[in-house]
């Protein structure tokens, strides 16, 4: 048995970034947000950018900007539990649309129906770095004048028709938390791409207060840098109290501006992120070459024009009896659909259901790591794990339609 234990996701942080963060946290390094804002405006084609203490805070603010008091937002039926936290924090009613489990993109017929049921805004989330079909959703929403918020917290350097994920919606959400591909330890950003939303950002910026120094970010980042090494990750991973890899609800807090330490780290991360994106894509391509044509384990297909950033490589268990291999970082996706989130139920409109595609993803989706700490020996172990599953023999008659039947006729 190998001692190595691979983290499912890892966001690199350099010693230089940690030093800058320590300097900002101690007050020895003066850090302004102007440089970061200008870089993000250019990178994401935004009129203005509001830096926040988390991606959840950025989404709360986006909901406040687009959904009137007592209004309703449309959410994907399968997504991160932070969407629930944002809905609770914004106090909005939620309706659900389904996802296509072939692509992780919105099921457009389901989007059409949720619009007919009545919503004031639609949130589209890119999952695991896979692009969602923003253009198709925007076309449906435009007929009713409904804004589309692009949640690119997991965009991870992916693109859609050559545009970076996060640069497409009328408002965009970024997250710089640990495990999001590019990290500052914490923090998020709200991107405005219309004059009206930019003016709303300008007014809101004055209400978020002055930034705290944020020494906790540096402690957390240093711990991540050390303990996510494959030779050490086994130690925190076996401690139940840490809940590593689990879906944990975090109650919303009043949105604040980004902490100074996180801002200092982010300045460095923005200059090096492209290298990690390229490395993830190379690892994903290698693993995908081993899956091509398999019937037992299938890869999620990007939407037309989409190029994933592969925060993780997403795979579907066509039979439904596959077990995770946590020491390899091969784990299941989110264990609940949004309608099953206990905290969301008071905010869920009557009769709303996640849909069969979302339920299928809950039951069948696996992700495997692609990050830069996946070494050659880890890649071989992952390849061996994949090989033992793609050669699994499906029951007679199930090979061709097993996955399709499972979600379309549920």
Protein language model features and the residues they cover:
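Active-site-proximal region of nucleotide-activated glycan assembly enzymes
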Residues: 2-9, 178, 189-210
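Conserved N-terminal alpha-helix of the aminotransferase class I/II PLP-enzyme fold
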Residues: 3, 7-57, 78, 280
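PLP-dependent aminotransferase class I/II
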Residues: 37-39, 43-50, 55, 79, ...
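A short acidic, amphipathic alpha-helical/loop segment
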Residues: 62, 86, 133-137, 187, ...
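Conserved PLP-anchoring active-site segment centered on the Schiff-base-forming lysine
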Residues: 62-115
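Anion (oxyanion) recognition and catalysis
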Residues: 88, 138, 142, 324-327
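Active-site phosphate-binding strand-loop segment of PLP-dependent enzymes
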Residues: 102-199
């Amino acid at each position: 048995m190998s001692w190595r234990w691979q983290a499912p996701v890892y966001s690199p942080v350099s010693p230089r970034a940690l030093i800058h963060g320590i300097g900002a946290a101690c007050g020895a390094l003066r850090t302004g947000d102007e440089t970061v804002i200008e870089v993000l405006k250019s990178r994401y084609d935004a009129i203005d950018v509001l830096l926040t203490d988390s991606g959840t805070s950025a989404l709360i603010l986006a909901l406040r900007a687009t959904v009137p008091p007592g209004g309703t937002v449309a959410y994907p039926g399968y997504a991160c539990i932070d969407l629930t936290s944002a809905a609770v924090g914004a106090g909005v009613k939620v309706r659900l649309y389904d996802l296509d489990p072939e692509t992780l993109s919105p099921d457009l017929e389901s989007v059409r129906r949720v619009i007919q049921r009545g919503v004031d805004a639609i949130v589209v989330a890119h999952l695991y770095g896979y692009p969602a079909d923003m253009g198709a959703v925007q076309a449906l929403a435009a007929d009713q004048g409904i804004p589309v918020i692009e949640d690119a917290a997991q965009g991870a350097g992916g693109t859609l028709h050559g545009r970076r994920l996060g640069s497409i919606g009328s408002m965009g959400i970024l997250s710089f938390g640990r495990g999001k591909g590019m990290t500052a330890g914490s923090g998020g950003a709200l991107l405005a791409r219309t004059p009206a939303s930019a003016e709303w950002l300008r007014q809101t910026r004055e209400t978020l207060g002055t930034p705290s120094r944020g020494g906790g970010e540096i402690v957390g980042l240093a711990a991540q840098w050390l303990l996510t090494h494959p030779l050490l990750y086994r130690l925190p991973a076996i401690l139940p109290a840490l809940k590593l890899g689990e879906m944990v609800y975090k109650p919303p807090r009043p949105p604040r501006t980004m902490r100074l330490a996180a801002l200092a780290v982010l300045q460095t991360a923005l200059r090096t992120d492209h290298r990690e994106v390229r490395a993830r894509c190379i690892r994903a391509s290698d693993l995908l070459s081993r899956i091509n044509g398999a019937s037992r384990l299938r890869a999620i297909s990007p939407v037309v024009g989409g190029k994933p950033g592969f925060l993780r490589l997403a795979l579907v268990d066509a039979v439904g009896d596959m077990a995770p291999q946590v020491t390899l970082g091969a784990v299941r996706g989110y264990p609940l659909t949004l309608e099953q989130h206990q905290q969301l139920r008071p905010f869920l409109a009557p009769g709303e259901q996640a849909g069969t595609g979302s339920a299928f993803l809950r039951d069948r989706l696996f992700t495997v790591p692609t990050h830069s700490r996946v070494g050659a020996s880890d890649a071989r172990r992952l390849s061996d794990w994949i090989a033992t599953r793609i050669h699994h023999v499906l029951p007679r008659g199930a090979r061709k339609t097993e996955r399709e039947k499972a979600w379309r006729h549920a």
